A protein has these predicted regions:
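C-terminal cap/substrate-recognition subdomain and adjoining C-terminal extension
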Residues: 41-124
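Alpha-helical substrate-recognition element adjacent to the catalytic core
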Residues: 1-66
Length: 124
């Protein structure tokens, strides 16, 4: 399986979880790509950050825009893609399963309850 992970607003929200997930995926022979809209000039810093978090990956790609991640998913033949923004999942292609996860999760800590689908849809 080929997995794509957004960095900012997704992977950096729970690097411990994604370190565990990527290690398990790669040890199972799966391909992991990190897709980010960071400046390509920050590649060394970004790679150091991922290494510091223990995130295992095969490739890192720097998108030219948020919507460019769709093209990258198609070119890399990504099967499953995790992101947090609508603009990033446009154009991924029908063969890619998208897990779009809102920043901060789906629990309203102020109200101390899970968000309903209707409320979550309005927020998104």
């Amino acid at each position: 399986m080929r997995i794509g992970l957004d960095l900012d607003g997704r992977l950096d929200e729970r690097p411990d979880f994604f370190a565990f997930l990527t290690a398990a995926l790669r040890s199972g022979g799966h391909f992991v790509a990190v897709l980010t809209y960071r400046d390509p000039a920050s590649q060394a810093k970004t790679e150091a950050q991922l290494s510091g978090w223990g995130v295992a990956y095969d490739e890192i790609h720097f998108a030219r825009s948020l919507s460019d991640k769709g093209r990258l998913c198609r070119e890399l033949a990504i099967d499953v893609y995790f992101d947090d923004q609508d603009e990033c999942v446009v154009g991924v292609g029908e063969k890619t399963t998208v897990f779009k996860i809102r920043n901060g999760g789906n629990f309203d800590f102020g109200e101390q309850k899970w968000l309903s689908i209707a409320k979550l849809t309005r927020l998104l």
